[in-house]
Amino acid sequence: MINITRLFDFPYYQQEKFNIPGALVTKHNGVWEKTSSTEYINKANTISRALIRMNIQKDDKIAVISTNNRTEWNIMDIGILQTGAQNVPIYPTISEDDYEYILNHSGAIYCFVSDEEVLRKVNLIRDKVPSLKEVYTFNTIEGAKNWTELLELGKDQSNQDSVEDRKNNVKPEDLATIIYTSGTTGKPKGVMLSHHNIVSDVLSSSSRIPFEPGTSVALSFLPVCHIFERMILYLYQYYGVSIYFGESIDKISDNIKEVKPNVMSAVPRLLEKVYDKIYAKGTELTGIKKSLLFCAIDLGLKYEPYGANGAWY
């Protein structure tokens, strides 16, 4: 069994232990498209081969900016990390000035963006980032380079040995990513995290998993440029959970109905909004329906996860 010490070990562990048909699932043109554990690894290796042919070196920085979570982001993540380079995820909603600052501060050589709006913002400051060689898009946009060009460049497997050498030279203590703060108190701050930093978080979270390994389904919608959701995605991979990526925050309720996930991560404010909406709707009910709803709410308030609330709860 694979010993997980680097972030790119997670997909290989998943393939060896679970090999699920829907490791990563994204909706395209109204259809949920699945990428299996094996396809995930194969495409990540294709990206790694392409990046090496593009002269990416150990400790180079590659920025990835996406307005929503998607399969392509995860493939790029593993493909980048396997070369010994670092993935620099950036919030899609920040200003052009912050893009300029982060891309310069990190020294990003390439940038991958999701859509036309993000591309427009990056192009506005592109000439002010001397290190930036090229910008690629995930969506097909006229006149823009597309990430599929890397999939084509990496098709030739003749340099796969170079990928394996790069992987073998990545140590747990090596830098894996630089995650920038949102910049609400000044310039964004770059947080440097090693492979071990994140791997240890994933492995230590195993005692809290609320799902069945190998058979569960997750819905992912929190921004993966934040360390919480990113760590959770590796945790899902570790436990063979099929990850469905939500289309947008506005479509979460629709996606939940479609996907019927066993688990998803959320933040308190979102849960408060859902609770308030349910509660407000409940106050409009009458009779037995109202009694049943508020009985269920009261029961939920008494739920004690992991026995963590103490004897007086």
Please give the residue ranges for each predicted region.
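A short N-terminal helical cap/helix-turn-helix that marks the beginning
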Residues: I2-L24, N42
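Conserved AMP-binding/adenylation subdomain of ANL enzymes
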Residues: V199-S220, V224-W312
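Conserved pre-ATP/AMP-binding loop-to-beta segment of ANL
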Residues: I20-G22, T137, K155-Y180, K187, ...
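ANL superfamily adenylate-forming
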Residues: E117-P172, I278-Y313
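Conserved AMP-binding A3 loop
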Residues: K34-T38, A176-V202
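Short beta-strand->loop structural element characteristic of the AMP-binding/adenylate-forming
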Residues: A63-I65, W73-D77, L81-E117, G190-M192, ...
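Conserved structural elements of the adenylate-forming
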Residues: I41-T46, P172, V191-F211
